[in-house]
Amino acid sequence: MDPINRRGLLGAGAAALPALALNVAPSAAREIDPELPEHWTALLNLLSKHDDAFGPRAVQGAVRHELRVIAEHRAVARGELCEALMRVESCWSEFSAWLAHDCGDHGGRQGLLERALHLARAADYPDMLAWARARQAQWADAPMALRAAEAGLRTPRASAHTRAMCATRAAYAHARLGDAASVERSIAEADHLVATESPPLPPPDSGMTGLLVRRWEARCWAALNPARAIGMYDDILRDQPRTWVREQGLYLAYVANACADAGELDRARAEGAKALAIARTTKSATATRELKRLGAVLQAA
C-alpha cells in the first residue's frame, strides 16, 4: 500500500464498513447486524495502517467516534454477539490507548488501557488481558513494568505470540535495571514463544511478531550497550515495511540516540535530522521525546 495515498486508505475504509446506519444507537438486540464484529475488526486494521503511514492524529478522532458507536451496540447486544462486541471494543480501546500515548495524552492513555482490561476480563479474552499487561509494562517505571510483564506472561490461555510480547517488555524492564543476564533470558523466552505455532496477536496485528521481538531486543541493548544496538537498529530499519512511516521516524530517532550514546556524534546528527523530518509529518510524541533527548545529549557533547 502506498504510504502517501490517503484517498486509497479512506476508500478502503468505506468498503470495510458497508452502508450501515451506525450513527444511530440500536434500540433492540435484534437490530444489530451479527457481522459487525468482523467489519469493525477490518476497520481497526485499516486505521492502524493509516496510523503507521500518517501518525496518530490522523486517526484519533475516527477511533474515538467508532469506540462510542461500538459501546452503544455492545450495551444493547445479548449473548455471543455481546461477547464478540466486548472483545472488539477491548481491541479498539487498546489501540486508542496507543494513539493517546503517541499524541502525548498519558492520562487518556491510562483510562483507555484500563477500559481494555475491564472489557477483556468481562469477555474472557486472555490474549487482550496479556497484551494490555504488556502495554502497561511498556509505559511504567522499571519495577512496575517487570510486575506487569510477568503478570501478562502468566495469563492462563494467552497465546504464545502474545506472551512473547510480554517477555519483551520484561526484557526491557531488566535492561533499565541494568540486568543483562535477565535480558538475555527474557529475549530467549520471547524467541522460543515466537517460534511456537500460535494464534496471532489481538487486532490490529501486523503479523510480524518476530520483527517486534528484534525491535525490543535492540532497545534493551541501547540501554545496556549502545554500540551493540546500532547494528541491530540498522537491520530493523532495513527490514521494516516501508509503509511503517511513523515507525521509520521513531527508529531513526532510536538509532540516533544510540549513536550519540556510543560517541558517534556525526552519525547521530545525520540520523536525527532524518527522524526530525518524519516526526514533523507524523507528529508522533514518542519520536519527539526521543529527539528532545538526542538534542540534549548533542548539546552537552
Predicted features and spans:
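Conserved binding/catalytic microenvironments
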Residues: 30-301
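N-terminal secretory signal peptides and thylakoid transit peptides that target proteins
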Residues: 1-16
